[in-house]
Design a protein with these regions (language model features):
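C-terminal His-loop and adjacent cap/lid subdomain of alpha/beta-hydrolase
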Residues: 18-123, 128-454
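Secretory targeting and sorting signals
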Residues: 1-17
């Protein structure tokens, strides 16, 4: 009889407690459709540990996914987790309007299939899906016990649109003032793709001169672009030229294309443009950037007048936001910081698509809401968007589980503790969690140079 009544308490007791009730269905992959038009996929492990991981995928194809990648899926199943995730229902690839509801609907469908109530459910979000999961942490609906965000877009769409506008405006206005490349209010995906291609061409050509490189570095500072994009170690702190080359590579290898084509999809979802730069003080933005020294050095070497460029940018900035689009994204695609369940966030220290500075802005929101005790953030010493090892992700999930077991964070999210847990999985990798304090989100709402209220 003990097995039949083992509920949430089972996971809190000693290891010899009754094992979790097993599902009504055999191990394997399952799929289904939701009323919203979304579909879902799930995996049941050989021996279920009682926990469901509700996975929220990133920006891109609206296809159901239930894990970050195949090796991580296999390890999670090996550890006994049941996995489920939805495709989201679109039509925009920026699916925040429907994603939270689609995720809960997928969870409900999976629970019906299992025929057993999970002892615990953890929302695990990646990139844009990290914003989905962070919103679930504020709206757990009695279903979600904890949240793990990975490379999460946790500063939300309003900030993303604003600081990316600062960056592309700087590139277009200083490098190609006569070209009139459209930066907001795209009429079609094709128009956005052409604008992205035009910006890539301008940046590629400008990289050939010291003046061009200095201005690309300035735009990169506004984009919160890391100075480390590829390789196992970053350029030396004073090697400003090498840092700039890494920023350039990130921009032309896909960064600019993602920023511009992604904006078109967000505009489609929001019904307009949420970004503004009219009234933004570009000198204050640069002064707040961790890369200000690099930019100033490259301007000096090029013999360029940085003050003049900053004055030009501030004077000519004239993009105003559409109030309806701002209201729409405020509702669907921003966080309040009002966490209702524990959350662990992990991020690489150098992320060219969702800068690690998102975590600084997010932590301030959570602190302002009085919920800092529920949030922990941990950082991986590597470059690239979502470039985590499977062991690093599983160790983070296990740390969150221990937080839910004990009710306390203690040192669970400390780098040394996470590294030891990851390496104990013996997956043939060495974990890279490191002490790190992210810089401010340059151009973020309420940061220097841009008002909190638009």
């Amino acid at each position: 009889g003990a097995v039949a009544v083992a509920g949430g308490a089972a996971s809190m007791t000693a290891a010899n407690a009754a094992p979790p009730v097993q599902p009504d269905v055999p191990p394997g992959e399952y799929r289904g459709d939701l009323a919203s038009g979304a579909d879902w996929m799930a995996h049941v492990p050989q021996e279920w540990n009682g926990t469901v991981v509700l996975f929220a995928h990133g920006f891109g194809q609206l296809a159901a996914q239930d894990a970050p990648d195949e090796p991580t899926r296999q390890e999670l199943l090996e550890q006994g987790y049941a996995l489920v995730g939805s495709s989201y229902s679109g039509p925009s690839l920026w699916a925040l309007e429907s994603a939270v509801d689609d995720q809960y609907a997928a969870l409900e469908a999976f629970e019906e299939l299992l025929g057993v109530e999970p002892e615990r459910t953890i929302a695990l979000g990646r990139s844009m899906g990290g914003l989905v999961s962070a919103r679930q942490a504020e709206d757990p609906r009695g279903e979600i016990d904890g949240v793990l965000t990975t490379c999460g877009l946790v500063a939300g769409a309003l900030n993303l649109n604003d600081y990316q506008l600062d960056g592309v405006y700087t590139l277009s206005h200083l490098l190609a003032p006569d070209q009139d490349i459209p930066l907001v209010r795209y009429e079609s995906p094709e128009q956005a793709a052409q604008a992205a291609a035009d910006l890539v061409a301008v940046v590629t050509e400008s990289q050939g001169t010291p003046e061009g490189r200095a201005r690309i570095a300035l735009a990169s500072a506004f984009l919160n672009m890391p100075t480390w994009y590829s390789g196992d170690v970053p350029p030396a702190p004073q090697d400003h030229q090498a840092q700039q080359v890494q920023q350039y590579e990130a921009l032309v290898a896909g960064g600019l294309e993602r920023y511009v084509t992604g904006r078109q999809q967000i505009e489609l979802a929001a019904g307009g443009n949420s970004a503004y730069n009219a009234g933004v003080d570009y000198r204050a933005l640069l002064d707040s950037s961790a890369h200000a020294d690099q930019v100033r050095a490259l301007y000096r070497e090029a013999g360029l007048d940085l003050d003049a460029d900053l004055a030009t940018l501030t004077r000519d900035a004239d993009v105003e936001a559409d109030p309806e689009a701002v209201a729409d994204l405020t509702r669907s695609s921003m966080v309040t910081g009002e966490l209702a369940v524990p959350e662990l966030a992990i991020h690489t220290v150098a992320d060219e698509l969702v800068p690690v500075e998102h975590e600084d802005w997010y932590a301030e929101q959570v602190a302002r809401a009085g919920e800092a005790g529920l949030l922990r953030q941990a950082y991986v010493d590597g470059a690239g968007h979502c470039e985590f090892q499977p062991a690093e992700q599983v160790a983070a999930l296990q740390a969150l589980e221990q937080r839910l077991d004990t009710g306390r964070w203690d040192d669970l999210a400390d780098p040394a503790r996470l590294n030891a847990a990851a390496d104990a999985l013996e997956l043939g990798t060495t974990a890279r969690f490191t002490p790190f304090d992210p810089a401010r989100l340059v151009g973020g709402l309420g940061e220097p140079g841009r008002d909190r209220d638009r």
